[in-house]
């Protein structure tokens, strides 16, 4: 299954088509940045871009499974948006924009609506909450994908939806991820009880990024972290 079909007219095996898709994504991304700037806001904050580039660098080094941990209201969504853009426009890590999947175990229509509104239009159908993953099964030729599990501590226990989706699609198998060029990032506000325990994998197979906040920094007020989300 395709996560969306916005780029179906492009053949991703053809270099010129891939380049045209990258140019289109850059155009749309930059226009969204300009739109937010006109409102006196930022689409992606420097801190968010930094963490997304750290994760992208791990992908470039052959890592296929990553964990990003940041406090509630810090701005994980911005990191996700930046990472999606970087992966889909990178010359070193090829991700098919039709195969972006952003899911959560929450049954929350508001989360889905808000997340879609933050994304460029062509990628909005990539967003799914609990009901969208209950029976999700990838095609046999599914590859070149980025799968993002937001708030991965939710519905991740045995026999729950997200974990069952992972097992059904062999996403715990690092060899399978490497062979198919599937990259996974799980986000959470706590390093405990995440979907994929980093301790189950050696460091060369898993990258973990944890945001450390200095709450004594006057430039990092509660309002700042609310705005950055």
Where would I find each of the regions flagged by the language model?
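Conserved pre-motif I regulatory segment
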Residues: 14-67
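Short basic/glycine-enriched coil/helix segment immediately N-terminal to the Walker B
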Residues: 63, 95, 134-145, 176-179
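Conserved Walker A/P-loop ATP-binding site and its immediately adjacent core
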Residues: 71-84, 88, 93-120
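Structural recognition of the conserved hydrophobic beta-strand(s) that form the central parallel beta-sheet
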Residues: 102-103, 148, 181-189
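Inter-Walker segment of RecA-like/P-loop motor cores
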Residues: 104-145
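Walker B catalytic acidic pair
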Residues: 150-152
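Short, conserved "post-DEAD/DEAH" coupling segment immediately C-terminal to helicase motif II
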Residues: 155-182
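Conserved interdomain linker/interface between the two RecA-like ATPase lobes of SF2 helicase motors
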Residues: 194-229
């Amino acid at each position: 299954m395709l996560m969306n079909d916005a780029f179906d007219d492009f053949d991703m095996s053809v270099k010129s088509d891939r380049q045209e898709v990258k140019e289109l994504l850059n155009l749309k991304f930059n226009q969204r940045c300009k739109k937010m700037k006109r409102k006196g806001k930022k689409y992606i904050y420097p801190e968010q871009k930094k963490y997304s580039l750290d994760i992208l660098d791990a992908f470039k080094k052959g890592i296929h499974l990553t964990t990003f941990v940041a406090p509630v209201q810090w701005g994980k969504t911005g990191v996700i948006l930046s990472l999606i853009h970087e992966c889909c426009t990178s010359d070193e890590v090829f991700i098919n924009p039709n195969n972006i999947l952003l899911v959560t175990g929450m049954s929350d229509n508001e989360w889905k609506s808000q997340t879609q509104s933050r994304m460029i239009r062509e990628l909005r159908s990539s967003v799914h909450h609990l009901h969208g993953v209950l029976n999700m099964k990838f095609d046999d030729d599914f590859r070149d994908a980025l799968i993002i599990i937001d708030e991965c501590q939710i519905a991740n226990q045995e026999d729950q939806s997200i974990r069952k989706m992972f097992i059904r699609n062999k996403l715990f198998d690092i060899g399978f991820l490497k062979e198919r060029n599937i990259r996974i990032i799980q986000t959470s506000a706590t390093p405990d009880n995440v979907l994929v325990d980093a301790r189950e994998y050696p460091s060369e197979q898993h990258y973990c990024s944890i945001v450390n906040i200095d709450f004594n920094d006057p430039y990092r007020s509660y309002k700042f972290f609310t705005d950055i989300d």
